[in-house]
């Protein structure tokens, strides 16, 4: 008889077996059992087990023996102890002895325990309740759950997980189902345990193939949430199969669950063991018997679902039938309820709403076809709103849902899931089950990638995206997964290394966004796969060091040297910059291919997004040099240099230059064939949350203006990040358009390593502090899915850490250099002596002829035709005006093989209708660019030069940044940007401050960009007057740029040519005229272009020609620009020979030698004045007032200023006031 009082119940056999092993060899038993087994006393058995025996008589004898009469067995041998009725029945049943040849075996171990337990169960008076429960919702939601788990961390949820948890919840409502019967002092007693300990019947198969059953308990189930319950369930099952269950696992089971349905049993009445009040049985899921012969289509049409039979076998002494029936009804209701499934989905971090129970909708199939198509359209348009893209999931109770994406909204129910509908080519099919449609839609638009493309107007692009996105997910190969993991290892290990070795140093780490490294790697790899020439990266400071090390390939030793502050003074001219602003260049080699590609990272300042237009210009210049461009018909080499731009989320939404740069994307003068944008979306800007920093749903909404597809991706899913990166490159190559990837992640630390973000975002950083990084979560997913082993993951990380440690130790041993003051970069580039800028007369004539060499049938505008004729006349006869002098300079450079690029607002015609560099046919709109004719020699051979002139968008910041970048990408090009009025250049002040004036000193980045800034006081008001000379002079130092305000067309001509030919890569700032464009005196003769060069200091022509007498001069007026002509006119009017006007044509660097030589010619001068139109606090005086006395102390120590009074605005808003002020300047100058 079984030991009913044993705490192990039907598991007692296992305990006895372990005891025997322990007795023979204690080390063969898990140590956790030792304490229990030391004093364990097994129940005595009737006899030792015997090996099976077989009767050996012949077959005839077997039959005879079977027929022979047998002595009836004694009642004591056959009756089960306990119930008298059972014993009497047993006594009446004669059990014949084994026949000859039968196999006879004494039962032992598990088999013997079954005998005991089953005999003991006969003493429990039981009854059984049965309930059939619809299984469709259970099936459908389990599919949703496991599909999500398959794509993320791996693992599966079984039906028994769900049914067991529902059972536990039902017990909370019916605690009587958890109690058991016993006798206390001989009195019948019902015991209600404090906790629900659910026993799981676990079928085990031994090494010999024999099967056995154990019942192990999940303790205190009522305290668990679903995820905890699943973890405990899996732990019990795993330990049971590994033979590692402990005594505690067997004791104290209060209610059991058995699932014979796993082997196809539909309806089971299990036996109830003493010590429990109920055992719940689960049958197989089957269609009702009468429908099992029907086809799937017919079953779906009728709305027939599978059923699962639940049985509750209970101790009738303490549980009544009504309680048992209500208990099953509660489980039934739970399995169909919204609340139960909501909790399950939340606990498993399934971000979507569960399938909801509802009755079938009998609408016609035609109507539902339309509804299914509407559902498909809804997912394509709105699916991104339901995508699981936020790795933090700050609102864990919130499901990713949208009414437009729910099947119920479209009049569809779970009964439609297995019905077939017409889908009109969706995923390459005409008909599909709704379940398959939903599965594809969820995978395409609502997993870890959200796709926005409904704003794209081109149907071909939308169809291409649909075909690429709406496909079955293909998991990367194991080799690819290991490679992705290696990149994550590298990204995380690099940051951890720096954090450990350089505590407290700012580095703006990538922690929390490590997946951007495999993402960038994949994008570059795909560019290499397409056979492209180069990827140029522009990015802010966050993560920059990581990108330099793990993407560009900058040597670790160099990065660590910069952290040490150990710079070699022989290599460090200029101010330098912080390590997270520097650029680098490297070569990328494909891991799974044979191609390579150049990779470079351009330098940038801390001004967020300022590098964006610079990068675009740099790339366009490289493309123009390669001359692949859009003329490549097959598209493979077209735009073969790819800009890869990284952004922050707050900056992408907040900085206006982003929109300005995006606006360049499809413009002829600026197009680069598509930029790959990656937004490292930390979901915070310094300390500002998104709801305070943007008004749009996404930080990427601004990109919709150019029809760029937008991919939102979860940064905790590196495989998704890699897939999106490759898709982005493919789209860019196919359509030559921008693509935006919004990688949602988080910032592990504050804005910098010394910042504590929890002060302003406490809840967010409570979540972040406990968040496992992308590397760990991806490693766990790979191991959970069985793709790699833990050892493989650990070995890869150790290898990388060891590499960093070795380099770190090497850097510590490098030569140490003492800290020295930085040296100027001024002497790094010197103007060559004897540089000739004059040209032959024949070239002037050829340029003049070009303006009348109109194509056949071309009709110039009647107001432009006289301009063209006048230009030809000037080329031969002289009196060359400013506009033509400029075109002569540019045309001559084209003829000499230079690429000349001129852009700006209205620059093709010119703000003041002066340039007319591109002619438009009056009738057809055809365009003709005369200077492009200079790109061909007279014999028809190409010179190698080009004249590219573009009207820019109405932008300064991006436009100037682009032109600066162009000069970095093509140092030999002559690149000019013209402001509409010089006043508006301050819209590009960040570019001027951070790149143009200081790029060489900070980064060694050279540029020869030319800014043409119309300037002059002419009564047009404060915003059409000043290009802010004072600001450029304040920025000038170390020869960082040339600043000039020429006053003659010929000097402007020579200035441009000197700049293009001197080999110096430094910017040129030219303050150009407005009214002087048509001033009759502001002209130059042909000899001024063919015989001389640029002169930084000009005297009046009378003195230069030897007509005027310098000895009569007692006062010198130093001035610059168009004011000279007003002063000269007044001098002529007043006949003042005691006064001379000297022009400073170059404002910086100040031409000290030329100025001294000029002033030394006037021996009797007693007064020096600086005369300017600008207010006293503006123009050149704020610098010249300090610098001129220091430059020439013997002459200019007492120099005085004549100007407008100090003003906050550049000028008066009244033209009449302007005239009065201008007159006062002249009066004072000649007073």
Swiss-Prot record:
Residues 38-79 are annotated as: Disordered. GO terms for molecular function: 2-hydroxy-3-oxoadipate synthase activity; 2-oxoglutarate decarboxylase activity; dihydrolipoyllysine-residue succinyltransferase activity; magnesium ion binding; oxidoreductase activity; oxidoreductase activity, acting on the aldehyde or oxo group of donors, disulfide as acceptor; thiamine pyrophosphate binding. It holds the Pfam family OxoGdeHyase_C. Keywords: Acyltransferase, Allosteric enzyme, Coiled coil, Decarboxylase, Lyase, Magnesium, Metal-binding, Multifunctional enzyme, Oxidoreductase, Thiamine pyrophosphate, Transferase, Tricarboxylic acid cycle. Residues 89-337 are annotated as: Succinyltransferase E2. Alpha-ketoglutarate dehydrogenase and decarboxylase activities are inhibited by unphosphorylated GarA, and allosterically activated by acetyl-CoA, the main substrate of the TCA cycle. Mg(2+) binds at residues 649, 682, 684. Residues 787-817 form a coiled coil. Residues 1-41 are annotated as: 2-oxoglutarate dehydrogenase E1, N-terminal part. Its EC number is 2.2.1.5, 4.1.1.71, 1.2.4.2, 2.3.1.61. Thiamine diphosphate binds at residues 542, 606, 608, 649-651, 682. Residues 338-1231 are annotated as: 2-oxoglutarate dehydrogenase E1, C-terminal part. Pathway: Carbohydrate metabolism; tricarboxylic acid cycle; succinate from 2-oxoglutarate (transferase route): step 1/2; Carbohydrate metabolism; tricarboxylic acid cycle; succinyl-CoA from 2-oxoglutarate (dehydrogenase route): step 1/1. Is a fusion protein with two major domains exhibiting structural features of an E1 and E2 protein, and a short sequence stretch of E1 localized at the N-terminus, which is connected by a linker region to the rest of the protein. Belongs to the 2-oxoacid dehydrogenase family. Kgd subfamily. This is Multifunctional 2-oxoglutarate metabolism enzyme.
């Amino acid at each position: 008889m079984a030991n009913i009082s044993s705490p192990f119940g039907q598991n007692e056999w296992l305990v006895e077996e372990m005891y025997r092993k322990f007795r023979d060899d204690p080390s063969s038993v898990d140590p956790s059992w030792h304490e229990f087994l030391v004093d364990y006393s097994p129940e005595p058995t009737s006899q030792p087990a015997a090996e099976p025996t077989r009767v050996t008589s012949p077959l005839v004898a077997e039959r005879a023996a079977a027929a022979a009469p047998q002595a009836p067995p004694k009642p004591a041998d056959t009756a089960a102890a306990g119930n008298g009725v059972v014993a009497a029945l047993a006594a009446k049943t004669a059990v014949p002895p084994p026949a000859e040849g039968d196999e006879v075996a004494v039962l032992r171990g598990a088999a013997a325990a079954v005998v005991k337990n089953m005999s003991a169960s006969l003493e429990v008076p039981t009854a059984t309740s049965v309930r059939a429960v619809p299984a469709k919702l259970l099936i459908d939601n389990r599919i949703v759950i496991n599909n999500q788990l398959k794509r993320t961390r791996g693992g599966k949820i079984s039906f028994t997980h769900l049914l067991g948890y529902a059972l536990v919840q039902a017990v909370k409502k019916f605690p009587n189902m958890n109690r058991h019967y016993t006798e206390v002092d001989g009195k019948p007693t019902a015991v209600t345990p404090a906790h629900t300990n659910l026993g799981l019947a676990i079928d085990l198969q031994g090494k010999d193939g024999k099967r056995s059953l154990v019942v192990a308990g999940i303790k205190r189930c009522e305290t668990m949430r679903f995820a905890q319950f699943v973890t405990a369930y899996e732990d019990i099952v795993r330990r049971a199969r590994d033979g590692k269950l402990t005594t505690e696992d067997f004791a104290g089971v209060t209610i059991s669950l058995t699932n014979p349905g796993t082997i196809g049993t539909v309806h089971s009445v299990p036996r109830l063991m003493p010590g429990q009040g109920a055992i719940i049985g689960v049958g197989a899921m089957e269609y009702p018997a009468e429908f099992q012969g029907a086809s799937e289509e017919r079953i779906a049409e009728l709305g027939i679902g599978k059923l699962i039979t639940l049985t509750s076998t209970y101790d009738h002494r303490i549980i009544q039938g009504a309680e048992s029936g209500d208990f099953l009804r509660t489980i039934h209701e739970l399995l169909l309820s919204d609340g139960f499934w909501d909790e399950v989905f939340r606990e498993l971090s399934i971000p979507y709403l569960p399938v909801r129970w509802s009755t079938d909708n009998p609408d016609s199939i035609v109507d539902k076809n339309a509804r299914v198509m509407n559902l498909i359209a809804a997912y394509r348009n709105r699916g991104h709103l339901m995508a699981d893209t936020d790795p933090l999931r700050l609102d864990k109770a919130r499901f990713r849902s949208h009414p437009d994406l729910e099947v119920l909204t479209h009049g569809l129910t779970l009964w439609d899931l297995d019905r077939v509908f017409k889908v009109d080519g969706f995923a390459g099919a005409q008909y599909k089950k709704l379940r398959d449609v939903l599965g594809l839609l969820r995978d395409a638009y609502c997993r870890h990638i959200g796709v926005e493309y409904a704003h794209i107007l081109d149907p071909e692009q939308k169809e291409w995206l649909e075909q690429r996105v709406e496909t079955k997910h293909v998991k990367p190969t194991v080799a690819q997964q290991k490679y992705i993991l290696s990149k994550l290892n590298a990204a995380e290990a690099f940051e951890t290394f720096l954090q450990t070795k350089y505590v407290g140093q700012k580095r703006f780490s990538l922690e929390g966004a490590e997946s951007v490294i495999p993402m960038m790697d994949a994008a570059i790899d795909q560019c290499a796969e397409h056979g492209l020439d180069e990827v140029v990266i522009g990015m802010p400071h966050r993560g920059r060091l990581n990108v330099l090390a793990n993407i560009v390939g900058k040597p670790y030793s160099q990065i660590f040297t910069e952290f040490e502050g150990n710079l070699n003074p022989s290599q460090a001219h200029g101010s330098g910059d912080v390590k997270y602003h520097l650029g680098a260049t490297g070569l990328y080699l494909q891991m799974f291919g044979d191609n390579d590609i150049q990779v470079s990272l351009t330098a940038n300042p801390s001004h967020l997004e300022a590098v964006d237009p610079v990068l675009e210009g740099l790339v366009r210049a490289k493309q123009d040099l390669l001359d692949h461009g859009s003329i490549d018909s097959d598209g493979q080499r077209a735009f073969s240099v790819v800009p890869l731009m990284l952004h922050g989320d707050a900056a992408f939404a907040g900085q206006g230059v982003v929109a300005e740069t995006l606006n360049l994307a499809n413009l002829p003068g600026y197009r680069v064939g598509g930029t790959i944008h990656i937004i490292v979306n930390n979901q915070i800007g310094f300390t500002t949350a998104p709801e305070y920093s943007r008004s749009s749903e996404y930080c990427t909404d601004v990109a919709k203006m150019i029809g760029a597809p937008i991919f939102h991706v979860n940064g905790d899913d590196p495989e998704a990040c890699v897939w999106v990166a490759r898709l982005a490159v493919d789209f860019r190559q196919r359509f030559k358009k921008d693509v935006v990837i919004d990688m949602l992640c988080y910032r592990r630390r504050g804005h910098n390593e010394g910042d504590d973000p929890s002060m302003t975002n406490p809840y967010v950083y409570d979540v972040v502090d406990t968040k496992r990084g992308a590397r760990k979560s991806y490693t766990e997913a790979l191991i959970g899915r069985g793709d790699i082993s833990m050892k493989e993951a650990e070995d890869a990380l150790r290898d990388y850490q060891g590499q960093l440690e070795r380099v770190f130790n090497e850097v510590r041993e490098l030569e140490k250099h003492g800290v020295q003051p930085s040296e100027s970069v001024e002497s790094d580039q010197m103007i060559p002596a004897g540089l000739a800028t004059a040209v032959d007369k024949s070239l002037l004539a050829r340029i003049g002829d070009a303006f009348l060499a109109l194509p056949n049938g071309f009709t110039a505008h009647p107001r432009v035709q006289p301009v063209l004729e006048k230009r030809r006349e000037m080329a031969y006869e002289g009196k060359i005006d400013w506009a033509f002098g400029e075109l002569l300079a540019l045309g001559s450079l084209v003829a000499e093989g230079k690429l000349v690029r001129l852009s700006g607002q209205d620059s093709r015609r010119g703000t003041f209708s002066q340039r007319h560099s591109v002619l438009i046919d009056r009738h057809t709109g055809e365009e003709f660019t005369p200077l492009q004719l200079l790109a061909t020699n007279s014999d028809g051979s190409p010179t190698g030069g080009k004249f590219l002139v573009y009207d820019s968008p109405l932008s300064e910041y991006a436009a100037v940044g682009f032109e600066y970048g162009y000069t970095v990408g093509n140092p030999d090009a002559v690149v000019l940007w013209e402001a509409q009025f010089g006043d508006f250049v301050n819209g590009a002040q960040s570019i001027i401050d951070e790149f143009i004036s200081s790029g060489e000193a900070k980064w060694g980045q050279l540029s020869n960009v030319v800014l043409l800034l119309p300037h002059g006081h002419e009564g047009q008001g404060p915003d059409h007057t000043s290009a802010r000379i004072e600001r450029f002079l304040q920025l000038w130092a170390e020869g960082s740029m040339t600043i000039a305000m020429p006053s003659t067309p010929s000097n402007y001509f020579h200035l441009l040519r000197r700049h293009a030919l001197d080999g110096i890569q430094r910017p040129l700032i030219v303050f150009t005229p407005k009214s002087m464009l048509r001033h009759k005196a502001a002209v130059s003769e042909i000899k001024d272009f063919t015989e001389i060069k640029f002169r930084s200091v000009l005297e009046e022509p009378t003195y230069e020609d030897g007509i005027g007498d310098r000895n009569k001069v007692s006062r010198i007026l130093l001035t610059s620009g168009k004011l000279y002509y007003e002063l000269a006119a007044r001098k002529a009017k007043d006949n003042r020979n005691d006064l001379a006007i000297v022009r400073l044509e170059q404002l910086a660097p100040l031409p000290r030698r030329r100025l001294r030589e000029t002033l030394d010619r006037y021996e009797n001068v007693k007064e020096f004045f600086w005369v300017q139109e600008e207010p006293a606090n503006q123009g050149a005086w704020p610098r010249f007032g300090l610098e001129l006395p220091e430059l020439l102390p013997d002459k200019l120590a007492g120099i005085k200023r004549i100007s407008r009074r100090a003003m906050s605005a550049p000028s008066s808003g009244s033209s009449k006031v302007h005239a009065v002020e201008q007159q006062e300047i002249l009066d004072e100058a000649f007073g």
